[in-house]
Amino acid sequence: MGKGTPSMGKHGRSKTHIRCRRCGRHAFNVAKGYCAACGFGRSKRIRRYSWQNKKVNRIRIR
């Protein structure tokens, strides 16, 4: 089998993300070794940005 379209069908077999040990969300990338939600495995600090929360009346709420 080559590297083109036939091999793309093999991508859906293994799990990309598993449950994270720190945040509990289903966002820990097995291949890269870090969580996409909280940043576990990449940094000690929890990944959190202000744009993750909705703004109401020009004031950012949690």
UniProtKB/Swiss-Prot annotation:
Binds 1 zinc ion per subunit. Its cofactor is Zn(2+). It holds the Pfam family Ribosomal_L37e. A zinc finger (C4-type) spans 20-38. InterPro entries: Ribosomal_eL37, Ribosomal_eL37/eL43, Ribosomal_eL37_CS, Ribosomal_zn-bd. Keywords: Metal-binding, Ribonucleoprotein, Ribosomal protein, RNA-binding, rRNA-binding, Zinc, Zinc-finger. SUPFAM superfamilies: Zn-binding ribosomal proteins. The keyword Zinc applies. GO terms for cellular component: cytosolic large ribosomal subunit. Gene3D superfamilies: 2.20.25.30. It comes from the Archaea. The keyword Disulfide bond does not apply. Zn(2+) binds at C20, C23, C35, C38. GO terms for biological process: translation. Binds to the 23S rRNA. NCBIfam families: PRK04179.1 (NF003214). PANTHER family: 60S RIBOSOMAL PROTEIN L37 (PTHR10768), RIBOSOMAL PROTEIN L37 (PTHR10768:SF0). Belongs to the eukaryotic ribosomal protein eL37 family. This is Large ribosomal subunit protein eL37. It comes from Staphylothermus marinus (strain ATCC 43588 / DSM 3639 / JCM 9404 / F1). The lineage of its organism: Archaea, Thermoproteota, Thermoprotei, Desulfurococcales, Desulfurococcaceae.
